[in-house]
Design a protein with these regions (language model features):
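Bacterial N-terminal signal peptides that target proteins for export
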Residues: 4-15
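Bacterial N-terminal signal peptides
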Residues: 15-25
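Histidine- and aromatic-rich segments of cupredoxin/plastocyanin-like copper-binding domains
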Residues: 155-170, 234-418
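Extracellular/periplasmic metallocenter environments
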Residues: 119-126, 137-220, 343-403, 485-489, ...
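C-terminal substrate/ligand-recognition segments
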Residues: 425-430, 437-500, 523-558
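N-terminal, post-signal-peptide metal-ligating segments of extracellular/periplasmic oxidoreductases
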Residues: 30-168, 174-176, 244, 248-300, ...
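Low-complexity, Pro/Ser/Thr- and charge-rich linker/hinge segments at domain boundaries
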Residues: 215-230, 402-431, 578-590
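Active/binding-pocket-proximal capping segment
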Residues: 317-334, 484-520, 562-565, 574-579
Length: 619
């Protein structure tokens, strides 16, 4: 992975984008226009002292929260930036009342209306966007442009909703979103963050993200009814040592297990310093503190809101792994949404969480005899060209009495009745397959990353390009997503969830299949690295992609290691009504020269010291 740090991000992304634009033909982009334009919104003024951070070792507090009323949540955001004491650039969404990145609570069927002003300083021009466009920025994308993605939500990809390809809000401009949540949106944890191609990593590394909670989970899984809940936003940021060093895409990442990025919990840094004068270097960690009452069970709702960092969560009591009971993954209660009620929680002793994924589980307080209760993220080794992040603590659990916790007593609602409307994915597992596709991650490090479609020419993402895939509304497709590179990648699909049918060939690198996700409905899944052996198959996942919803239009799938997405590992999917699908696919077949052979065979992309490169074909 090896994403760059803040002082280098503009030059690195500019080089990558220039290479993309010089090698790609620009073709028409057709955006769905089924939206009602809002009136010109009033500007939201800047807020003093934006983007506050907390000292290492601080107590975790629940983020500020806003709740919908009468079916609507209306929010005003000022998007701002500042620098911290380590000269890191921070980004955040501030409300006029001074709330930073508040948690947004809605219910299925609600409207989320966000009026946002981009109050960051204008930066240089990045590229022109072909018409049609959305947002006041028109056709000019800059290094300070903004939009907002409502990650994991099954909402519309149209203008003023969850559209990220052509929505541009430049510095000084104001825009209004009106995001309609489906009436059968699964209750659970989602999140929001900027998604302008080329600069998504720097915004998320800077901290511009917040949680979205679709309330009502207690009526899908009564086991959480009335429990004390914790919204735990885990973010990453450049480490202090490497602010002035170049850590671009290169084999091996940081040496000797030094964390590639610092990790924060609720804006509390946990990685304070690495002493590089010692051999091997020694990193000092200062975990945050989370309070629990003795004997209680809490509902931990964890969002991996990092730009680039994979987590593997484990709760330890004096070094011994404890059982976590998984309630939901990626906003969907496990073993639900298929027309039946949940069959129970899934016990795990660790849970691997890709960037942008969410997990919600029950955690029990330690006995008073335990000396150290700690949530850690385990060692993450992501391949020859990836990172080697060591075991590191996130927070220590500290027992307190009930009075000390009164101010933090945020509880899930009480179970009232079984929610019979939560059947969004009913029948997906047995639906007829309209098409089978193979897509794969590929790269030429350090500046070219691809989300390839079998049978199509390889090209990095260009927002002006035609869709890579056209699908028909109302159908189900089966996709095999392969990894042809020497580092892990994370597959994300906008606007919908998919059913993870299988995880394939993970054992070639002695990787184990992550627990608790096969057979579940996800919007994120990790595909481990290939080992470079031409006799070995590519690791892959097999997915059922659910196009049966009402939404049509253009949206994207991509690697959610945002450094990779920014450098081209993304493509456009267009969903069209059934009447238009046949003509669209016929036209595309007439213009695309299909490659021969199956992608399950080695394609001759040979590993080198700088990545998987080459263009040789093997028979």
């Amino acid at each position: 992975m090896n994403g760059g740090n803040m002082p280098q991000v503009h030059s690195r992304i500019l080089v990558g984008l220039l290479m993309i634009l010089t090698m790609m033909p620009v073709s028409a982009f057709a955006q769905s226009t089924s939206f009602i334009a809002s009136s010109t919104p009033a500007r939201i003024p800047s807020v003093a002292n934006p983007c506050p951070r907390f000292a290492p070792g601080s107590v975790i507090h629940q983020p500020s929260a806003l709740f919908s009323q009468n079916g609507v949540l209306s929010v005003q955001f000022s998007y701002q930036s500042t620098t911290d004491s380590a000269n890191r650039t921070l980004y955040c969404f501030m409300t006029p009342a001074g709330l930073e990145n508040p948690t947004l609570h809605v219910r299925p069927g609600d409207h989320l209306i966000i009026t946002v002003t981009n109050n960051t300083q204008p930066l240089g021009f990045m590229m022109m966007l072909d018409a049609p466009n959305c947002g006041p920025g028109g056709n000019q994308m800059t290094f300070s442009s903004l939009n907002i993605h409502y990650h994991g939500t099954n909402t519309s990809p149209t203008c003023h909703s969850d559209e990220v390809i052509k929505t541009i809000i430049n510095s000084g401009e104001t825009f209004q979103y009106n995001v309609a949540f489906p009436s059968n949106e699964p209750p659970g944890l989602y999140w929001y963050h900027p998604h302008v191609h080329g600069i998504a990593e720097k915004a998320v590394l800077g901290g511009a993200s917040g949680a979205i909670v679709v309330d009502g989970i207690e009526n899908v899984q009564p086991a959480v009814s009335g429990l004390h809940q914790r919204i735990l936003m885990i973010r990453d940021q450049p480490t202090v040592q490497f602010q002035e060093q170049m850590l671009m895409e290169s084999p091996g990442g940081t040496p000797n297990g030094i964390p590639f990025q610092d990790v924060t919990v609720a804006n509390i840094s946990t990685n304070t310093m690495t002493d590089t004068t010692q051999n091997p270097p020694v990193t000092t960690y200062t975990p945050a503190i989370l309070h629990m009452e003795g004997g209680e069970t809490q509902f931990w709702r964890v969002s991996n809101s990092t730009a680039d960092t994979i987590l593997d969560l484990q709760l330890r009591f004096d070094g011994v792994a404890q059982t976590l009971r998984v309630v939901a993954v990626d906003g969907v209660v496990v073993n639900s949404q298929d027309g039946s009620q949940p069959s129970g929680l899934i016990p795990v002793t660790h849970f691997r969480l890709p960037p942008a994924s969410r997990v919600e589980f029950l955690a029990s307080a330690p006995p008073a005899s335990v000396k150290l209760a700690q949530l850690v993220t385990l060692n993450i080794l992501t391949g020859q060209n990836g990172d080697d992040d060591p075991n590191r603590p996130l927070f220590n659990v500290q027992l307190v009495n009930e009075d000390d916790e009164a101010a933090e007593d945020d509880r899930v609602g009480q179970f009232s009745s079984v929610n019979l409307n939560q059947k969004r994915f009913a029948g997906l597992a047995t639906a007829p397959i309209a098409a089978k596709r193979v897509v794969f991650f590929n790269e030429n490090q350090p500046t070219q990353f691809f989300m390839d479609v079998q049978g199509q020419p390889e090209q990095p993402f260009n927002p002006n390009a035609a869709p890579a895939i056209t699908a028909t509304q109302g159908t189900v497709e089966e996709w095999t997503v392969e990894n042809h590179t020497l580092e892990n990648h994370e597959f994300h699909f906008h606007q919908l969830h998919f059913l993870l049918e299988s995880q394939n060939n993970f054992g070639i690198n002695r990787d184990q299949e992550p627990p608790a996700i096969t057979g579940q409905y996800l919007d994120m899944v990790e595909v481990p690295n290939w080992d470079g052996n031409l006799d070995h198959p590519y690791p892959s996942v097999t997915l059922r992609i659910d196009f049966r919803g009402h939404d049509i239009g253009d949206f994207v799938s991509h690697c959610h290691i945002l450094n990779h997405e920014d450098l081209g590992m993304m493509n456009i999917i267009r969903v069209v009504p059934p009447a238009k699908s046949a003509n669209t696919n016929a036209a595309r077949k007439a213009t695309v020269s299909a490659k021969t052979g199956s992608s399950t065979k080695r394609s001759g992309l040979l590993p080198t010291s700088t990545g998987v490169m080459g263009n040789m074909k093997m028979n």
